[in-house]
Every structure is written in structure tokens, then in C-alpha cells.
């Protein structure tokens, strides 16, 4: 494997996940289902999720949307708000299917749903149903399923389809996930997901309870080309962004920048991990989270320029973010 650049030699290698911009058959999207978790944000979070689903579906020009609800009541609400979607009722803890759902490898008849251990982001939020929702979604989609014996969340990695991924040391080397060395993590990424080159970034965003998921920090937009945020003048993550840029340059990857939302505060006055990098790349549209700050529109414009042939759509995600993530975090694509 290549670390920061060096390919691992390897024996048996898994089929790789396709890059997110490859054609999708469908997408699983988690639908907020537990009033005890979402409290006063539930209704607005439901509406934000439904708007995201509609943008991805694009009137049938996009991809099939499978809204995953944890109970019959939430399923009924999902059908009302998103009548274009298939609603799948399967018990789960919360909506973060990027991390709890399966990663679908390969394409066509050769697809395999690959699952991993999940421990609530290092024991922070261990909720019933999150540990096996991936296997149940794979079964409902009639996809063969395999599960690895180590903890890995989908939001912790981002690949370019050619065998290279970016990730963060803060998450993948965190002892609250696994007791694995860097070399052991790299070997497992090769064996289970076919990734030959791991580019290690340092820390993720401030106050990110996932311990620095890379899908809030750096995203591939083409083979060998990575988008990262450019800090604002008072950006709480300025040092993180500078460090990421330096490591990506050292790895000889092509870097493009998006604006950063800057300093976005929650109701308690604390910095929240708002990021435009948590966009979702659908068949017809790239959906970019918006936070009601000055750089919202500029971020959408940059994303649209990066994906010719797709429209970029900015949608508010304030209430989803109160749960800890945004559009990429609640979705998991199924390649065609």
C-alpha cells in the first residue's frame, strides 16, 4: 500500500467501492425517527431530509431514493413528505447511514455490501439497531453481505475510484475505535476495500463528535483531485485546513478549494462542525449543505463548476446538523 503516497503490495484485494460520482442505482437516506433524540428539531430535520431526498431524486432524472425510517410512525411521515421515495422501515438508532450502512463494492452483478463494526463513534452514542442496520439494508436490497471484524465508519474515508483514499489520523488511529497500528489499518483497508494508497490527514473539524471524519474536511472530486476548505479570517478550523493542504501537497494530489462557512455557532454559543464538504454527489445533482452564512452561495457555485453535467443545489441543513452531521452523513449510495 502506499502511505502518503506509497502503494502497498498485497495479495488478495477486495473489489473497490466506486467513486461517488459513478452512476448510482439508488441511495439510502436516513429519516429522523426518534423524538427523544431530535427533540424540538424533529419536524424541521424531517423537512430538510425530505428536501434533500427530492433534490437527489430530481423528478426521476436522478436516482431511486430509499428513505429508511426506524418505525411505522416515521415511515408514514416519510411517505407524506416524500411520496416519490421508497420507504424502508427497519429499526435503527439514528440516521447516520454513511457510518452504519454498508459500503457497496463493485458494480452490476458483482456488487457486494461490505459491513464493519460500529461502536457509536468510540462509545459516545451506542444506540440499538445501529450495529446491524447495514446487514438488514443489504438483505432488503438483495445484495450479498460480508462483515469485517474491525470498526470503520464510511464517513471516515473518501476514495477516488483509482485505489487512493484520504482519511484522518484522529479517527482511524483512535484507540476508541480499534487497537490497530497504522500499518494494520492500511492492510485492512486493502484487504476489505481494495484501497492501495492511504493519504493520512491529521485532525478533523473542531467539536466533531466523530473524531474528525474526513467527509467534513477533504473530498475527492475526480481521480487524484481533492477539494478542501479555504479558511475565513476568523475560522476556528484554519490550522486544520492548512495542515490538510500541506499533507495533500506532499502526497502530490491536485488541490481545489471551496469556501468555508467560517465560525458557525450553535444555540449554546459553541462552535459547530458546519462544512460545505459534506455534499452528496448524486446522478443528477450535487447537494451542498447551507447554514445561512455569507459563503453559502459561493460554495454552491464552486461545487457546480467541479461537476460538469450536474446541477449543484444548496439546501439548508441547520436542523440536521444539530444531530451532528449533514447530507453526506445521512446517505449511502448503491452503485449501478
Predicted regions and their residues:
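The feature marks the mature, well-folded catalytic cores of soluble enzymes
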Residues: 5-336
Amino acid at each position: 500500500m502506499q502511505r502518503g503516497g506509497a502503494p502497498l503490495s498485497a495479495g488478495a484485494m477486495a473489489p473497490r467501492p466506486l467513486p461517488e460520482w459513478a452512476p448510482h442505482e439508488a441511495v439510502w437516506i436516513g429519516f429522523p425517527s426518534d423524538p427523544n433524540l431530535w427533540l424540538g428539531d424533529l419536524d424541521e430535520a424531517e423537512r430538510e431530509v425530505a428536501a434533500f431526498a427530492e433534490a437527489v431524486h430530481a423528478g426521476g432524472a436522478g436516482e431511486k431514493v430509499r428513505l429508511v425510517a426506524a418505525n411505522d410512525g416515521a415511515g408514514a411521515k416519510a411517505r407524506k413528505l416524500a411520496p416519490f421515495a421508497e420507504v424502508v422501515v427497519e429499526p435503527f438508532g439514528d440516521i447516520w447511514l454513511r457510518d452504519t450502512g454498508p459500503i457497496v463494492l463493485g458494480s452490476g452483478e458483482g456488487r457486494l455490501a461490505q459491513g464493519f463494526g460500529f461502536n457509536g463513534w468510540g462509545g459516545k452514542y451506542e444506540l440499538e439497531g445501529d450495529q446491524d442496520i447495514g446487514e438488514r439494508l443489504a438483505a432488503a436490497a438483495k445484495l450479498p453481505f460480508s462483515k469485517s471484524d474491525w470498526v470503520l465508519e464510511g464517513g471516515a474515508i473518501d476514495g477516488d475510484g483509482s485505489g487512493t483514499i484520504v482519511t484522518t489520523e484522529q479517527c482511524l488511529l483512535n484507540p476508541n475505535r480499534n487497537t490497530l497500528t497504522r500499518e494494520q489499518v492500511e492492510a485492512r483497508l486493502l484487504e476489505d476495500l481494495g484501497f492501495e494508497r492511504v493519504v493520512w490527514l491529521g485532525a478533523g473539524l473542531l467539536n466533531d463528535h466523530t473524531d474528525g471524519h474526513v467527509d467534513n474536511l477533504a473530498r475527492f472530486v475526480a481521480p487524484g483531485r481533492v477539494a478542501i476548505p479555504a479558511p475565513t479570517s476568523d475560522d476556528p478550523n484554519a490550522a486544520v485546513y492548512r495542515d490538510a493542504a500541506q499533507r495533500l501537497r506532499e502526497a502530490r494530489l491536485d488541490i481545489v478549494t471551496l469556501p468555508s462557512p467560517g465560525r458557525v455557532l450553535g444555540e449554546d454559543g459553541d462552535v459547530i462542525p458546519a462544512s460545505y464538504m459534506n455534499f452528496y454527489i448524486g446522478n443528477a445533482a450535487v447537494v451542498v449543505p447551507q447554514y445561512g452564512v455569507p459563503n453559502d452561495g459561493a460554495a454552491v457555485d464552486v461545487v457546480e463548476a467541479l461537476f460538469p453535467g450536474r446541477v449543484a443545489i444548496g439546501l439548508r441543513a441547520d436542523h440536521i446538523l444539530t444531530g451532528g452531521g449533514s447530507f453526506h452523513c445521512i446517505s449511502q449510495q448503491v452503485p449501478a
